[in-house]
């Protein structure tokens, strides 16, 4: 089947009562993004011509969160079953296309399994994804005659013999648009739930002489749905275990794979070492021989070769050239940039600031809206005072500057190359090159000073 002649319908109208949340169920995050986004991503990777998202509860929130302009939004005002949901989308189906039906709360479905399902779909028939369970209680059973699928019966409507069947319906199927529209128009709600079941089209297709081909997923977790937070947490751990396995096989050393979370994409070089409880968010790119210490969080960062991030550092939208060292307990906020061999130590925060080649900020400093040259020493307790209560201002420090401890640089201000700022100085005016600047109150000694004594 040609992917150019395919549309996807994603059912996402459920409220998710058992989540006990005001957030629509399909927006609850798995691996850092809404679970329905995983399904949308799979549909896009398949090359679907159209992706129809059927929504109900929390429509405005869904639209504000899922901003991909390629989605076609289909309202299901009343939730009257899966068949009813598909009926709402049916007017959008082309007669000559195949339509793949997915679920927003089944987030781990793989592109590989869906490709096999579409390839297995008989001409004019239905491709159906099924699994076999040791305990199929509660699920719709696959009814076969002479090994051919002839129908699906829901658990509540099944007789005792049918309840012994262990092959169950996952709900995922693909069918021709023209046939699907006709079968959807023939559905009724004459069942124990009083709902329109999409599963009834299997019997309708069989009655039309159409063949139904069943395909099994590569892993059972691919078709596990989410109805409560326990199930969501289970799928999160399954997903993370799979990502850890892929990284290990690709040469990344995860010192404790069970305590690593990938909530985005990790692009990596060779000989990477990542300690326990590290979280990767967004897109993170690591060069060769990078070491990430325990408890670090990296989001949308580029880390050069031979860098070391010590434990409990948080980096977001930061760029590090080669041979940089960061932390422990450092924070690099968006716009932080370190040149080759730069060092940021414990309890140093950077935001929209560049630290030049070989420059160091070792301890307890804030560097915001700053351009810092090469071979600069930033003493402990240095603050770039960048905010005047209304606007942000820039601090520029030239090459080879030595900034003493407990220095405040009140921006906008610039410091010429080679200058020295004495400890405890508040800089309010520009400094030229090779100057010594200090602005302390003269130290006074009073002999025999007696501190006040509390009255008893």
Curated annotation (Swiss-Prot):
Residues 1-229 are annotated as: Pyrophosphorylase. Acetyl-CoA binds at residues 380, 386-387, 405, 423, 440. UDP-N-acetyl-alpha-D-glucosamine binds at residues 11-14, 25, 76, 81-82, 103-105, 140, 154, 169, 227, 333, 351, 366, 377. Residues 230-250 are annotated as: Linker. GO terms for cellular component: cytoplasm; membrane. The keyword Ribosomal protein does not apply. Transmembrane segments: none annotated. Keywords: Acyltransferase, Cell shape, Cell wall biogenesis/degradation, Cytoplasm, Magnesium, Metal-binding, Multifunctional enzyme, Nucleotidyltransferase, Peptidoglycan synthesis, Repeat, Transferase. CDD domains: GT2_GlmU_N_bac, LbH_GlmU_C. The active site is at 363 (proton acceptor). In the N-terminal section; belongs to the N-acetylglucosamine-1-phosphate uridyltransferase family. In the C-terminal section; belongs to the transferase hexapeptide repeat family. This is Bifunctional protein GlmU. It comes from Serratia proteamaculans (strain 568). The gene is glmU.
């Amino acid at each position: 089947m040609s992917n150019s002649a395919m549309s996807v319908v994603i059912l996402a109208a459920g409220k998710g009562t058992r989540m006990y949340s005001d957030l629509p169920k399909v927006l609850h995050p798995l691996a850092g993004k809404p679970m329905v986004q995983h399904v949308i991503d799979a549909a896009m990777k398949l090359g679907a011509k159209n992706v129809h998202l059927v929504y109900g509860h929390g429509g405005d929130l869904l639209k504000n969160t899922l901003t991909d302009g390629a989605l076609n939004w289909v309202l299901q005002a009343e939730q009257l079953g899966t068949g009813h949901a598909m009926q709402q989308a049916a007017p959008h189906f082309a007669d000559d296309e195949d339509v793949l039906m997915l679920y927003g709360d089944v987030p781990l479905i793989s592109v590989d399994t869906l490709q096999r399902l579409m390839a297995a779909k008989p001409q004019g028939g239905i491709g159906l994804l099924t699994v076999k369970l040791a305990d199929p209680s509660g699920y719709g059973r696959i009814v076969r005659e002479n090994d051919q699928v002839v129908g699906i019966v829901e658990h509540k409507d099944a007789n005792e013999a049918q309840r012994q069947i262990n092959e169950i319906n996952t709900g995922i199927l693909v069918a021709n648009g023209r046939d699907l529209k006709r079968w959807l128009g023939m559905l009724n709600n004459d069942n124990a739930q009083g709902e329109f079941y999409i599963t009834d089209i299997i019997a309708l297709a069989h009655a039309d002489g159409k063949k139904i081909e069943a395909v099994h997923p590569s892993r059972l977790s691919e078709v596990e749905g989410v109805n409560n937070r326990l199930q969501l947490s289970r799928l999160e751990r399954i997903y993370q275990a799979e990502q850890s396995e892929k990284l290990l096989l690709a040469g990344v050393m995860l010192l404790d794979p069970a305590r690593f979370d990938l909530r985005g994409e990790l692009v990596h070089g060779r000989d990477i070492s990542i300690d326990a409880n590290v979280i990767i968010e967004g897109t993170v790119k690591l060069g060769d021989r990078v070491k990430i210490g325990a408890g670090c969080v990296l989001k949308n960062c580029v880390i050069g070769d031979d860098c070391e991030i010590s434990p409990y550092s948080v980096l977001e939208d930061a760029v590090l050239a080669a041979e940089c060292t960061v932390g422990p307990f450092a924070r690099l906020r968006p716009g932080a940039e370190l040149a080759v061999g730069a060092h940021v130590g414990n309890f140093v925060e950077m935001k929209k600031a560049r630290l030049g080649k070989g420059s160091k900020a070792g301890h307890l400093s804030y560097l915001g809206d700053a351009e810092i040259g090469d071979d600069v020493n930033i003493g402990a307790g240095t603050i770039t005072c960048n905010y005047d209560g209304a606007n942000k201002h820039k601090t520029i420090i030239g090459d080879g500057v030595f900034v003493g401890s407990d220095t405040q640089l009140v921006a906008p201000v610039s410091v010429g190359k080679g200058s020295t700022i004495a400890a405890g100085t508040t800089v309010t005016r520009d400094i030229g090159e090779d100057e010594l600047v200090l602005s302390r109150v003269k130290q006074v000694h009073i002999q025999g000073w007696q501190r006040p004594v509390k009255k008893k």
